[in-house]
Amino acid sequence: MTSSPTAAARTEGEAAPTVPTQVESGTAQRPGLAREMVAILDFGSQYSELIARRIRETKVYSEVLSYQTPIAEIRRLAPKGIILSGGPNSVYEAYAPQCDPALWELGIPILGVCYGMQLMVQQLGGAVERAERAEYGKASLFINDPTDLFTNVEDGTTMWMSHADSVLRMPEGFELLAHTENTPCAAIAHHSRHLYGVQFHPEVVHSRGGMALLRNFVYHICGCEPEWTTAAFIEEAIREVRARVGDKRVLLALSGGVDSSTLAFLLHRAIGDNLTCMFIDQGFMRKNEPERLVKLFKEQFHIPVAYVDAAERFIVRLEGVSDPEQKRKIIGAEFIRVFESESQRLGPFDYLAQGTLYPDIIESAGENIDPKTGERVAVKIKSHHNVGGLPENLRFKLVEPLKRLFKDEVRQVGRALGLPEEIVQRQPFPGPGLAIRVLGELTKDKVDILREADFILRQEVNRSGRYNDYWQSFAVLLPVKTVGVMGDRRTYAYALALRFVTSEDGMTADWARVPYDLLEQIANRIVNEVPGINRVVLDITSKPPGTIEWE
């Protein structure tokens, strides 16, 4: 998503061919005035949303759909192309997810990725079997046919493999496009039917030629135009908000992060004074943030903010609770209760605005259902406070104009709306705040200890000039005490973990290689300036297998 579309976005500036299809023009409304889209059918891969993000980077709108989406609905949406995601199953398993065979007769260009390629092969008469040698990680891709899908992709380029099955026999009419040392059929195609399959994952950052391949598919094979832009999204989002809300009043929970701040700017532009922002201080914010935030919005942005001090209410509700899922749900539910009570004082209000993003929806469990077990194919990771914690008796209607955007797209929208860089580049901060960074049972004393340690960490990271180098940098108070020595006295105090990660969208993350001198400065200040902490450790876990937050 960029500020303006450009034909120069095409690979080598080539014109896109017109691909004839048997799908009629769709009438579905699409965000951002996107006349064209690429649909991703999700078979349970954790990378499905990453595929969507990569397609959007080509300035083409994409949407993730269930693999069970009826053919009639796909016809109605009229995508210019379809991508079949990977998945955890084997296509020859009795209850493996299957797509409607009519999909292959739509005349729409289709790209199968990993499981998606194997499904294409199996349903069209080829054969898939357990590979003699599974292939995981980086592999050199040797290109047999450098045209079409592999135009401008370097022979021998690195691609990311993650499969234990392989294609034994291609369906009739298919040709071999590429192979690796361990995978004879790494890419295949039926050119006249516009059907393509790749065994690797072009969407992951480790696949060096992945974006070139996806651009070839989107521009040259599907014939898409680069029209998914920031300006177009803002225009359409404002139109949709006005159409949905009308002259009704909207209440927005403001946190000061880029999501809620961007949403506030967007809604204020759409409905003006019919928006009321409410900042609920639940007692788990970072040091000095509540005061700074309210002043900033009132005095600089001229957007009224109602401040609510609800710290005592939250602490009481969370007393004795140590399970992280319960914490999130309790905090989410209490947020809504506070909103309901305060809205009666400030209202009436008809709508509650939420800064829900695409990853929030995905991580709170996907929409695919396993036909055998009835369970969701995408395994639930953790519920987010603005998704999983909402009570059933919610009195507000929801408005969520950002729910199909990734974090980087939200930053672009915020910047285009005039949001200051200090907020645009603000690191993600969880809705439950420091409550989920104090492991185990919460107490006010523990939160205060963590708040001081977090303040020191942020001070030193900012002073180092490395704040924007990290997706997130924060501290976690551990539920264990350790023995230490300060002066001539023995201490017995809490251990604190430091967490620094790099990421593009929060879906995956790597632990950051933080300079030792910065770590030393942070650790020394914390143990010397924060009573209650005598040990600092560093978390070097990536996501997966871990999550970014500890709870």
Curated annotation (Swiss-Prot):
GO terms for cellular component: cytosol. One of its GO terms (molecular function) is ATP binding. ATP binds at S255, G256, G257, V258, D259, S260, S261. Keywords: ATP-binding, Glutamine amidotransferase, GMP biosynthesis, Ligase, Nucleotide-binding, Purine biosynthesis. Residues 228-426 form the GMPS ATP-PPase domain. One of its GO terms (biological process) is GMP biosynthetic process. Pathway: Purine metabolism; GMP biosynthesis; GMP from XMP (L-Gln route): step 1/1. Catalyzes the synthesis of GMP from XMP. PANTHER family: GMP SYNTHASE [GLUTAMINE-HYDROLYZING], GMP SYNTHASE-RELATED. HAMAP family: GMP_synthase. This is GMP synthase [glutamine-hydrolyzing]. It comes from Gloeobacter violaceus (strain ATCC 29082 / PCC 7421).
